Amino acid sequence: MSHPLIFPDFDPVAFHIGPLAVRWYALAYMVSFIIALPIARRLNRLAPEVATNEQVDDFLFYAILGVLLGGRLGYVLFYRPMDYLSHPLEIFKTWDGGMSFHGGALGVILALAYFSWKTRLSFLAFADRIVPVVPIGLGLGRCANFVNGELWGRPASPDLPWAMIFPTGGPIPRHPSELYEALTEGVLLLCVMLFAASRPQVRERFGFLSGLFLFGYACARSFCEFFRQPDANIGFLSGGTTMGQLLCIPMALAGMGLMVYAMRRPAQVSAHV
């Protein structure tokens, strides 16, 4: 019988810049954007022409706003609406944690829609050049969740070699579900998206990559939810499902719909509108 691993004693603060404490989650966001931007620029140079690299750079500001505002509001609305209704000022305490990917995704979609309208770009074509790099942020974000010792998994067999005891998870060994999500939503989905984006026949079907991302994320997240402990204030829903799985259903349906729509339309050689 193997002994479960003990969660490492990580400092919740990655480093300090003078009086400013930079936490791991904020660092994950910053590193994600630094890594993702040059890759998105490289993808944008591939045919068919969609946007200029300057437009990709400009969109970064809108993407950051979409992720932060959408992620926070999504967490408030999807996971703890009554708590924040009673204490509305708590919404602004982002340093205490509480972000939702589904909310962040909606925020980025709205940012994409506004930016595409403002710059007269094709919404689906431009989105296809952005979404392949999103798994970078997902993977690093889940790594930050692990370092923070949060969003841990369900109880695991003590014989599981990587079963771990988390400081806030009680004395029982658990699945390190944050790392499962980092590997599936991050590494695996990134490989799938970059491979698909490298195929000219895929890039010419505007909307296909966006649909593939939505469907791929929904599948990866739904799978990992079987190992992740549900939020304590929500618990399990009907049939043993979780809120994360419930929110993935419309995402998967939208993804499949986009892929079918893209494949039924003729291939495009230009994205100018």
UniProtKB/Swiss-Prot annotation:
Keywords: Cell inner membrane, Cell membrane, Membrane, Transferase, Transmembrane, Transmembrane helix. InterPro entries: Lgt (IPR001640). Its main location: membrane. Its EC number is 2.5.1.145. Pathway: Protein modification; lipoprotein biosynthesis (diacylglyceryl transfer). It is a multi-pass membrane protein. It is found in: Cell inner membrane. PROSITE patterns: LGT. A 1,2-diacyl-sn-glycero-3-phospho-(1'-sn-glycerol) binds at R142. It comes from the Bacteria. GO terms for cellular component: plasma membrane. Catalyzes the transfer of the diacylglyceryl group from phosphatidylglycerol to the sulfhydryl group of the N-terminal cysteine of a prolipoprotein, the first step in the formation of mature lipoproteins. Belongs to the Lgt family. This is Phosphatidylglycerol--prolipoprotein diacylglyceryl transferase. It comes from Gluconobacter oxydans (strain 621H) (Gluconobacter suboxydans).
